[in-house]
Amino acid sequence: MDKNLVIIPTYNEKENIEAIIRKVFSLEGCFHILVIDDGSPDGTAGIVKSLMAEFPERLDIIERKGKLGLGTAYLTGFKWALERGYDYVCEMDADFSHNPDDLPAMFAACAECGGVSVGSRYCDGISVVNWPVGRILMSYYASKYVRGVLRMKVHDCTAGFVCYSRAALEAIDLDDVRMKGYGFQIEMKYTAFKLGFRIVEVPIIFVNRKMGTSKMSSGIFGEAFWGVIKLRFRKFHKKGE
C-alpha cells in the first residue's frame, strides 16, 4: 500500500486545525498528516499535540520558531517525508480552502501520472467561492501570466493544493529552491515540468477561509511576479546530475 502524507503548514489556525485533522482522518484510505507550525502564539501546536495520542503514528508536528515562510515549511516537510519513505506527499491549507474530500482524487491522479497533480481552480472555468472579484481576477490573470512566460501547460500555476510523487521530490534539488512565499508554488511546479515530470490538473472548488486570517501580502505577490522571469532563464538538472 502506498504511503500518503498530507502536509499542513500553520500559523494561528486554532479555529481550524482540529477540524481539518479529524476530517482528513475520517476519509477512506490511510492518510498521515504532518503539521508544520511556525510558532503560532494562539496555541495551534498545543491542539495538534493533544490529538497525537488519539492518532498515534498518523499525526506528527514540527514546531519552528517564528514565521519562516510557506515555502520553507513545505521544503522541511518534503525532506521529512522522503526520510520516512512516503510515496506521495500533498500540500494542503489548514483553513478548508482546500476540501479534504478531494484528497483521494489528488493522490490517485498523482499515482497515475507519476509526477505532480494540481488541485486546479481554473481548468474548468473559474471555481472560487467567497473571494472578492478583484482577488479572483488577480489570481486568474497571474496564472495566465505565469503560464505565458514559462510556457507551462498548467491552468492554475499558483495553486497551493498540490501532490508530488516521491520520484519528483527526489529529482528536485530541494536545497536549490529559491522562492519562499507563494512563488515557491510556481517554482516547484516549473522545476518538475522542466525535469520531465507530467503535471495533471484535478478540478476543485476553492472556498475562501471562513475562520482565521489570510497570510497573503503584496510582498509575497511581488516575489512571485519577478521570480517568474528569473525562472524562465534558469537551467534545471535532476539532483546529483
Region roles according to the model:
Residues 8, 30-40, 62-63, 92:
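Short beta-strand/loop segment that forms part of the nucleotide-sugar
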Residues 64-83, 88, 100-182, 209-226:
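Acceptor/aglycone-binding surface of glycosyltransferases and processive sugar-polymer synthases
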Residues 3-5, 32, 187:
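Cell-envelope/extracellular polymer assembly enzymes that use nucleotide-activated donors
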Residues 1-23:
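N-proximal low-complexity "stem/linker" segments adjacent to membrane-targeting elements
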Residues 152-153, 176-180, 189-206:
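Catalytic donor-sugar/metal-binding loop of nucleotide-sugar-dependent glycosyltransferases
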Residues 22-31:
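Short, acidic, metal-binding catalytic loop of nucleotide-sugar glycosyltransferases
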